[in-house]
């Protein structure tokens, strides 16, 4: 039935350019509060520079580049009002990993982003950017920042941020929201 999907899959292939697969299953799709679902995806993208021509003729088109090879993999899930996702993008020896979760019943959420030797210059070669190493964690509960019960925290550590051949890493940010009060600390 439309409400239950036992198994679904997708395969996209263009020799020399794209190899992408995804599969998943779901129950109670039409009721987000009861939905249970899981999905996985994996892609290998090569020699995709031809896509740059599809961008509007603008300053962005002249500044952006698509690396020769990009790998993408991840998962997503839903469990009766709780949603999660995890994804990793790899290229030119670097990686971005993203994980997140949201529980709509308890209004709890969290996200983690990691960049390990991620080559920003592979995407924006004209912007004097280099490698990026950082870790970001954020989480909390409650959606209204003015309510005293809402809590949140952010932790950011930038170990390396290259710009014009210099490293501007070594920056840390910690911020907390609790009891209607926001506090934070920035250090280098």
What name fits each language-model region?
Residues 148-152:
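Short flexible loop/turn segments that cap and initiate beta-strands
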Residues 154-158:
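Tryptophan-anchored aromatic micro-motifs
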């Amino acid at each position: 039935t439309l409400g239950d999907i036992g198994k679904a899959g997708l395969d996209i292939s263009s020799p020399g350019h794209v190899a992408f697969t995804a599969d998943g299953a779901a129950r109670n799709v039409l009721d987000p509060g009861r939905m249970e679902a899981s999905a996985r995806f994996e892609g290998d993208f090569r020699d995709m520079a031809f896509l740059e021509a599809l961008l509007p003729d603008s300053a962005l088109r002249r500044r952006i580049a698509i690396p020769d090879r990009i790998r993408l993999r991840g998962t997503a899930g839903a469990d009766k009002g709780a949603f999660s996702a995890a994804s990793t993008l790899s290229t030119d020896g670097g990686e971005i990993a993203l994980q997140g979760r949201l529980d709509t019943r308890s209004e709890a959420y969290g996200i983690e982003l990691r960049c390990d030797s991620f080559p920003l210059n592979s995407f924006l070669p004209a912007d004097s950017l280099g490698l990026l190493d950082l870790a970001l964690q954020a989480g909390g509960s409650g959606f209204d920042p003015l309510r005293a019960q809402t809590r949140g925290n952010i932790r950011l550590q930038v170990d390396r941020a290259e710009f014009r051949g210099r490293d501007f890493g070594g920056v840390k940010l910690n911020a907390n929201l609790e009891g209607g009060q926001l506090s934070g600390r920035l250090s280098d």
